[in-house]
Amino acid sequence: MKTKLNRRGRRQRGYRGLLWVLAAGLLLFGLIAQQNILLGTSSRHALLMDARTGQVLARKRSGEEAAPASLTKMMTVLLATEALPDLDTPVTLPEDIFPALYKADASMAGFQPGETVTVRDLLYGAMLPSGAECCEALARQVSGSEEAFVALMNRKAGELGMKHTHFANCTGLTSPEHYSSAADLAVLLQAALNNETFRTVFTTGQYTSSVTAQHPKGLYMASTLLSRLDGGEVTGGQILGGKTGYTDAAGLCLASLAVVNGRVYSGHAGGTRKPRDGADQHHGCCAGVPQTGKEKMTGLRQFYR
């Protein structure tokens, strides 16, 4: 099993290397925020939003329905934070969820079958390393089954006005009945960031889980986005947090939050096939003065207080 997990981990790290390049380019568009810039990106669909006002600054096929990959986990984490306010509640990862996840080659945080962790551990495990086992465990804890939890996901999507979204699972694995759009994912993130627990998890770069028999030193986790960026600083600003995703059907996907010159932006992109273009966008679109971590957190507190 270790060989299989290590192989999966190497493949995931390769994808993550491509994703951070995409992030550096796409999410500081707010400095110029012009439609023709987005039209030139390799992302099939993208959207840039002022995260404070909700104003859409630029878009490209933002209403097109497409596979969201692991961006799905934003909804899973949001619902779990709403339903499970006691983050210290113990949860045992069901052994029966693992075979199907291994077979699907789903991304995993690294928890083991039968391991007992906390809700907090699972939230970070779902968001930072994109652990599918964490999503499945949270779904079971909230609703008793993934099917029942997915019904909650679709109900929440309807309440938020996500008209081009339908969920078929809580992890983002490819399914014909599992789709969303850049515009809908922007709406989801906008709503989720008003949840303090979600916001904290979304903007965290690294985390170590509670001690268990299987992990006597805890399980170290790093954000698939921020771990590739030195402190989140890129030319022109600071990436505060984000969620990456990849499947063959979805391509490279990203939802992220960045601050530039005191203004907070939400960026969403998917269907990207050419990581090189992300670097081109980074050099062509980013300018300004990078902010320190202190400025970043102060601005975020002011924005969401």
Positions of predicted regions on the chain:
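N-terminal Lys/Arg-rich, disordered targeting/topogenic segments
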Residues: 1-15
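Leucine-biased recognition of intrinsically disordered, low-complexity hydrophobic segments
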Residues: 5, 28, 297-300
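Intrinsically disordered, low-complexity regions enriched in polar/acidic and amide residues
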Residues: 11, 33-34, 301
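A generic short-segment signal for beta-strand/edge and adjacent turn/coil regions
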Residues: 14-18, 59-62, 91-95, 103-107, ...
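Active-site-adjacent loops and short helices of periplasmic peptidoglycan-processing enzymes
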Residues: 30-183, 192-196, 260
